[in-house]
Every structure is written in C-alpha cells, then in structure tokens.
Amino acid sequence: MFCPLKLILLPVLLDYSLGLNDLNVSPPELTVHVGDSALMGCVFQSTEDKCIFKIDWTLSPGEHAKDEYVLYYYSNLSVPIGRFQNRVHLMGDILCNDGSLLLQDVQEADQGTYICEIRLKGESQVFKKAVVLHVLPEEPKELMVHVGGLIQMGCVFQSTEVKHVTKVEWIFSGRRAKEEIVFRYYHKLRMSVEYSQSWGHFQNRVNLVGDIFRNDGSIMLQGVRESDGGNYTCSIHLGNLVFKKTIVLHVSPEEPRTLVTPAALRPLVLGGNQLVIIVGIVCATILLLPVLILIVKKTCGNKSSVNSTVLVKNTKKTNPEIKEKPCHFERCEGEKHIYSPIIVREVIEEEEPSEKSEATYMTMHPVWPSLRSDRNNSLEKKSGGGMPKTQQAF
C-alpha cells in the first residue's frame, strides 16, 4: 500500500530539491543590448497534474541595492510592477508549469540577477530558478552604406530556453515603395527561401549569415542600390512568441574613402592602350629634350650679344668726348695698337658713399704699316719743342 505512495512522492521531492539547488549551481547568463528583448525561462518539471498557484519574479541588482519586484502572477492574474510595467510579460504556458518571462526594451538599470519562484497549489515547497542578465550599450539602429557596397543587419533574440525558430522574415518599406519581402526562412522546409525577381529586387543579393539554432536571423545585403534605402523589419518566430527589430538603412551615392589595406597596395595592371600612351609620351619627351636645350642656349646667346652692343652704343652717346688717342707702343711687327679710354659710370654703394674716380680702360686698334711714316713725321715735328722723344712718345 505504501509502495505506490513512495513512488509518487519520490519524483516530486526530487523535483523540489533540484529546484532549490538551482541557486547553488551557476545560473544561466544572457547578454543583450539596450533596447532589445530577453526571454528568461522558468519551467517547473513535475509528474503531478497540479496547477501553478503563484509566480514571483524579482530582481537583485547587486550587493548594495535592494531587491525589487518585477512581476507576480496570482489566480490567473499577471501584474507587472513599478518601472517594468508595459515591458514584462509571462510568455510560458501556465498549464505546463512554464512561467518564463519576456523582458522588452531592456535598459541599463535592468542588469542583475532575476529570480523566479513557482508555487503549486496545495504545496508548501517553492521552485526557484535564477538568470543573470548582462546589458550592453545600444546597437546602432541606423546604418550607413555606399552604393555598390555590402551591409550586415543583425537580428538576434536572446533566450535561456532552447526553442526552435519556426520562421524568420525580413520586410522592407521604403519612402516611395510599398512593403516588400526581402528574405524568409521556414523551419519546416529546413532551408532559406529567397524570392524570385517577380517578388522584388532583392533576389540573389540577400544571404542568411546568422545561426538559426541560436535564434540569430542576421542577413547580409550585397550590391547595395540607392533604392535599398529605407526601413528593414526583422521578425523571429519561436512558436507563438514573436520578436521584432527594425533597422533604418541610409544609402549614400558617394564613393567611400578606402583605407590603406594590403589589398589596396596590390600593383595596378595597365591595359594595352594605357601602356602604349605612356611609352609614347616618354619617347617624345626624350626626343624633344635636346632640341629644347639648343633653343634655350641660342636664345640666351642672342640676348647677351644684343645687350653688349646696346651697352657700347649707350656709352658712346653718354660720353661723346671719348676719342681714340694713339699710343705709340709697338707690340708686333706690321701693326700698331691705339688705346682709347672708356669711361664707366661710377658705382655708388648704399652703405658707404664713395668718391672714387672713374675707371679708365684702354682699347687697342690695329694700324696698318702705311701709316707708320706719317706717325713718325708728326712725332719728329712735335719733338722740336725741346722735350726728349721718349717722353713725348710716352
């Protein structure tokens, strides 16, 4: 008589003991971003068909903070409390002893340890389970991409319970376009389904990059066009539970400023026409370079000769008293040299005003031998004045 009773009580006591010891074992952890949702499981396994009488969810922020109520369930009534109103819901099946909690629009202050307590009707024992929630900064809801580039749009639903994703759907809505299905995944087909072009212009440009078994429905959009700018809404279905997330995509027509990467440092391969043009330019430059040098030299020589001629003419005009005076020194046979003074303008320095005399230079002009006798006769006549010939000649 007592054996069946022992067999019934033993699993129940084991279940209660496991539930109480869940706090001693390291609890599961969830990491979510600000603004996302988190599903914290609290499932009580029991062999008896007893209904849940009460469920309490509390938050323990830390050592120096007080615990606060999140939600409580009593007599088929679920009541969120305090700052968690409109953000928490019981998503489990109460009839199946499932008191899982869905926390939406997660805030930084929501970080901490969440404790679930389940009481069955007519039982004094309490089943407890803890979940540690870590909160990260908010992910950008607006993304920027350039035309022709690629962009990854994330969509992850964090949950402690292992639930199969039944459906993943991405819907696009632009400013000038109606809603259009971008990507759809069915769990029954066990394959991703991309719509043909008749369904939209995303065909062959969207790939699933997330892990469906981890509730990750992220996609990659390639070959971005200007018309791709708009809102992208992701929906992850876990049975009756639906998680949604919206991303705004901005498309810029400008080319991105590429960073210096090893791929960018690869040598550029020139085409046939470009190579011919470059070789032609180099050859023409080499051939024309000597001609340009000769032209420059000739131009400089002409300018110098013209300048010297103008200088001599200007000197004669400014000093008309300058005449050729004979000099009677014979330096070679058959010709004489006549020295005439050339007066050069005085150079005045700004720092030291000088009173230097004008410099005098002598120029030699050849005299033909036929004029030698006439010159000698004139010298003999002048020497009759009583001065020595050498001095007069000098």
Swiss-Prot record:
Signal peptide: 1-19
Ranges where the record places region Disordered: 369-394
Disulfide bridge positions per record: 42-116, 155-234
Induction / repression: Up-regulated upon retinoic acid, Me2SO and PMA treatment in differentiating myeloid leukemia cells.
Protein's cellular compartments: Cell membrane; Cell junction
Cytoplasmic membrane side: 297-394
Known glycosylation sites: 76, 231
SMART domains, per the entry: IG (SM00409)
Segments of skewed composition (Basic and acidic residues): 372-383
Ig-like V-type domain sequence ranges: 20-132, 137-250
Transmembrane annotation, as ranges: 276-296
Ranges per topology, Extracellular: 20-275
One Gene Ontology term, aspect cellular component: nucleoplasm
InterPro entries, per the entry: Ig-like_dom (IPR007110), Ig-like_dom_sf (IPR036179), Ig-like_fold (IPR013783), Ig_sub (IPR003599), Ig_V-set (IPR013106), Myelin_P0-rel (IPR000920)
GO-annotated molecular function: cell adhesion molecule binding; integrin binding; protein homodimerization activity
Tissues expressing the protein: Expression is restricted to the hematopoietic tissues with the exception of liver. Expressed in fetal liver, spleen and thymus. Preferentially expressed by mature leukocytes (at protein level).
Pfam hit, one: V-set
Keyword list, A-Z: Cell adhesion, Cell junction, Cell membrane, Disulfide bond, Glycoprotein, Immunity, Immunoglobulin domain, Membrane, Repeat, Signal, Transmembrane, Transmembrane helix
Membrane topology: Single-pass type I membrane protein
GO biological process, one term: gamma-delta T cell activation
Domain commentary: The Ig-like V-type domain 1 mediates interaction with CXADR. The Ig-like V-type domain 2 may also play a role in the interaction.
Subunit structure: Homodimer; active form in leukocyte-endothelial cell adhesion. Interacts (homodimeric form) with CXADR. Interacts (via cytoplasmic domain) with the PI3 kinase; upon CXADR-binding. Interacts with ITGA4 and ITGB1; integrin alpha-4/beta-1 may regulate leukocyte to endothelial cells adhesion by controlling JAML homodimerization.
Family: Belongs to the immunoglobulin superfamily.
Function: Transmembrane protein of the plasma membrane of leukocytes that control their migration and activation through interaction with CXADR, a plasma membrane receptor found on adjacent epithelial and endothelial cells. The interaction between both receptors mediates the activation of gamma-delta T-cells, a subpopulation of T-cells residing in epithelia and involved in tissue homeostasis and repair. Upon epithelial CXADR-binding, JAML induces downstream cell signaling events in gamma-delta T-cells through PI3-kinase and MAP kinases.
Protein name: Junctional adhesion molecule-like
Gene expressing this chain: JAML
